[in-house]
Amino acid sequence: MPDRSGSTTRFPISRRVFMAGSGAFLLLRPSSASRAADEKVTFIFIADVHACRMGAGLSPNCQQEGKTDANLLRHIRALNDLEYKHWPEVIDGNPTGLANAGKLIGRPRGVVVGGDMTDDGGGQTAERDEGTQILQFSHRYREGTGPDMVHVPVYSGLGNHDLDQDGRPPDTEWYRDELRDYVRFNHENSVFFKPPVPAANFDPLSDCYSWDWGPLHLVQLHRFGGDTRKGAVSALPWLKQDLATNAANGKPVVLFQHYGWDPFSTERWDPAKSTFDDTGHGKPHWWTQQEQQALLDTITGANVIGIFHGHEHDTPMIYRTGNIDLFKPIASFKGGFALAELEAKRFSVVLGQAFDEFGGVKFTNAFQKASS
């Protein structure tokens, strides 16, 4: 894989355990308000829900791929049950070494979605019945009560499957508009309307937004920071100003988007194989090296302690690009999630997967970095 900014780890770090060595810790520089800096922030990240309802049934191939409502309900039960579980002490027989190992996880601040809330924005079909997919998503991944809804606020994010669908002419934009309207309805403040999950800073041009949980600044970038596909407006000028305004003086920052720096997200056309893969040297499939570097340049100088992303469905990953740590759970319809906590200048992340119908989970990866 070509170098983008420093070195990029080609493959996910061990499925068992990754612990950042003390010499590689990224320092979380102290906040001016020590009390706020010591506040604990716990949150969940998910991606690739792929709500697949089509009218009264499912979109083609969704049943075979496991993109079913039953699997989403199993996922939601696992997310809701996490607050009653404990940070893992052992994964696959190996000690995690987490400083918070064995401690109760507690109630998370919210669930952040890293794109592909729906399935059929990726160009599969162009039917009005697709509108039931965002309806299905909203009935499941919205704060509510009972076993069939998430019990904490949900911060929505859009991926290629939400943004790439062209409707039949002349209504080519209807699907994208519907998904962007969902983000605005849920997160954009206005004089006339208070959204269910308000963002502190919402960019009306790109629909990217940011908010704070105590000592942590969080930013939703949808497909990726700087996306201009299908008429999108680049969020990079807004992001630069947002970080300067809200994350100065070393405040820790976490970014969320759909694409990452993993081999699938960075694959290119391979003419010898007539396909996109991670050994090709032709046209990039998802985003270009220039777009990747532009995002990295924009966040240079900010204390970005992690980027969470989705897009690839099957492999949990903890890896680096340059000096940035990246975290990618498996797809939500396969039960995947990331659980993160910032406490006392220590950042912990575990990846996991729902494995039964009763809220059970299996943790697959663990990561922690500390500061002085």
Annotate each language-model stretch with its function:
Residues A56-T68, G123-T132, G167-W174, T266-W287:
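Short, flexible/disordered intra-domain loops and linkers
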Residues D81-G97, K103-R107, M149-V150, L205, ...:
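His/acidic metal-ligating clusters that form di-metal
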Residues D119-A247, D278, A294-T300, M317-V349, ...:
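Extended active-site neighborhood of metal-dependent phosphoesterases/phosphodiesterases
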